[in-house]
Amino acid sequence: MKNIREIAKEKILILDGAMGTEIQKYNLTEDDFRGERFRDVPGMMKGNNDMLNITRPDVISDIYRRYLEAGADIITANTFSCQRISQADYHLEDCAREMAFEGARLARIECDKFSTPDKPRFVAGDVGPTNKTCSMSPDVSNPAAREITYDELFTDVSEQVDGLIEGGADVILIETIFDTLNCKAMIDAAITMMKKHGVELPIMISLTVSDLAGRTLSGQTVDAFLASLSPYPIFSVGMNCAFGAPQMKPFIEHLAKVAPYYISAHPNAGLPNEMGQYDETAESMAPQIAEFIDEGIVNIIGGCCGTSPEFIAHYARSAEGKKPHQVVEKPKYMWLSGLDLLQVDDSVHLPVDASRFVNVGERCNVAGSRKFLRLINEKSYEEAIGIARKQVADGAAVVDVNMDDGLLDAKAEMVNFLNMIAAEPEIAKVPVMIDSSKWEVILAGLKCCQGKCIVNSISLKEGEEVFLSHARDVMRYGAAVVVMCFDEVGQATTYERRIEIAERAYRLLVDKLGMNPLDIIFDPNVLAIATGMEEHDNYAVEFIRATEWIHRNLPGAHVSGGVSNLSFSFRGNTYIREAIHCVFLHHAQKVGMDFGIVNAKARMDYNKIPKDQLELIEDVVLNRRKGAADDLIELAAEIKAKADAAKAAAKAGGAPAPKPAAPEWRKQPVEERLKYALQKGITEFLQPDIDEALQKYPHAVNVIEGPLMDGMNLVGELFGRGEMFLPQVVKTARTMKAAVSILQPHIEAEKQGGSTTAGKILMATVKGDVHDIGKNIVCVVMSCNNYDIIDLGVMVPAEQIVKKAIEEKVDAVGLSGLITPSLEEMVRTAKEMQKAGLRIPIMVGGATTSELHVALKIAPVYDGPVIWVKDASLNAGICARFLNETECPKFVAELNERYERLRNEYHEQQAKIASLEEARKNKLDLF
């Protein structure tokens, strides 16, 4: 019987559809979910679909069977949330592996019943993303914090995959990925468990993007996501959830053009309507899916939320006899990534005469920057982050980070700094180079990066065994690597030794380990020249010769170097040092040097160096004549003397140093400056701008209600249009919090010591729903806008919400829900609040919620204000209107008027639909 890899080349494979949608059709009770075994477990079990593998295996097997009858080639095991971290919400952590095993075992039994030599059926062990993220902080005041670590997720998913493999999975499907670091940990766990069991199962990856701009929730573009996964042995890449077929199609088309894997798509049954239901039918979806098939952009097609066996039957018929997508070739260029893709090809360069060159920013290195070391020692992280930000602004395409100092905890500082810059989109967009001589520091850093970063470095210094072990780690964590030309004998200083070590390392990495040569960056050792020792004079020449040899003889490999080492003899003379670097890079880049650890801002233009100086510097760098180094030392002394004299004259004359020109946005009125600062997350000028605003506005709170809220509303609009993504919104929220903290003493003074919070808000994900990422984002944004947040977490019963709201005397309640059953629970919560005599505002949000549902179902059962909030960035502004005594009545009246109009329009539309259905029933049959 053929395996799935062989079949994927010949035909389009049919994946099954939604599991949750089908389970709902059985109208299972709490007792069905619990069974006898879990009768006494605290909390609500209904909604924990994975436990049905144990308590109602008949239901799960029946669903598998119906999908197989519909023509599915691949059955997705009911194991989406079989991780300890997910089952903790139900107090069933210790059953997670058993659920995974049973889910796969039941699927195996049904697949084996339907398998034939002509149509074998396969079990996909399903690994969901969990409701935690490794890449983002749950605490706005501490961007370095993480709710879960790579190691914790790796451990949980390892246990899950262990159960899936033992249960009979043929494939591991890691799906609905919104954070690439989560995905990396899951791939790592899957590969580790396969090795344990002695099997090699295909790994299917399916991401979900958060908006039509095409970024994941954690901020990566689709291309950056592909780069992050490029070192791993992936079978297929695709997308699921979030969108219906038309919205998903452009992304699948792009994947089909650039991803060197089989392509999968399992879209929802359209987009949820206002009532949280899916309007698409199997018949209406069939032609949409047929486009994916007929255009040859997929190898695997199936369904997600809202789909059923009827949908899959239509898809199977559409795919019959159709040719699958032809997988594109692997990229010929190196892929690196932060939030964005960095493709190291002919377009990556700064100087016009370079073929390709990547500036690696050198200033975030405690060994190379005294200022950076001081800031890290003083825990002045905001200033240290500013150094990274400036390097990127100055042209660094990669940021090198090194924390190796005897007085620092290098591992802790590396993790802390990498986590902090991950929250800075203008830095996080570029890849990171993790630089350390301590391997445990490098490993810790690798577990912080969702992008594809660079390890700096490994070498043969400790022999082949250690070298290969380190290289395996690099591959395991999905990175590229710098290989130093250093072996057991020592550092290579001659051309011959450089190429000997480079070739040996290349063969070990490529031939023995199977590393992609594009992920190898050799550092042939940039060493100091013009030191006064004749044997050093040829170091630059031999580096350049070795670079050319590597470029010609080691296909795919790159060359880098720490450029500032070259001019070490001239420390203290910046001009000469930068001129030496410029000349060296000019010649090294011509023959294949494509990376360099440099100060990007200090790059000189080769063509603007005075001709006499250029000739002398080239004599030294290229070792063209004896005595050139002495002449350069003399020139350096002359230049330094002139510079010192100019400084002394300026000081004697009292002439102040010229100030840099202010950026254009600083010339705008204070309101516009504050809005811009919020949008871009700039805190540098908040104090003077707020001081100016306080002179203009009668009360400090007016600054919040005016320009600051205007800025937040603008961010909300941009986010809604897909022009900003989540990490940017979170950074905006932190900037808002900083602004409010500046205003707080003024508000206190005006209130004579009264409360300075904008209001107390209770937040909860309703009973039956364990999704809390959206709610957590709302909590972050609201707290940054000076609201006191009480977060009850997930799976919160209506009675608990009411009790806490009364106890805490909250000003408003926020209800969150991601799944369709949550809509009914929100109605019940509103009824319970009504019964308890509460009339405080209710804010409703989440993927399945809508304004129409609020108007039809929630507002009519509650006398207080109820509003649907489209996204997290809008909550603060809405709350401000509700809690403003002057604004609130007008706002509520507008809402009630709008709800009445929506209800009338809905009922009119339903009447038309009913009339049409009646007419169809009463049609005259003439034939």
Please state what every model-predicted region is.
Residues 1-927:
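Domain-level signal for soluble alpha/beta catalytic cores
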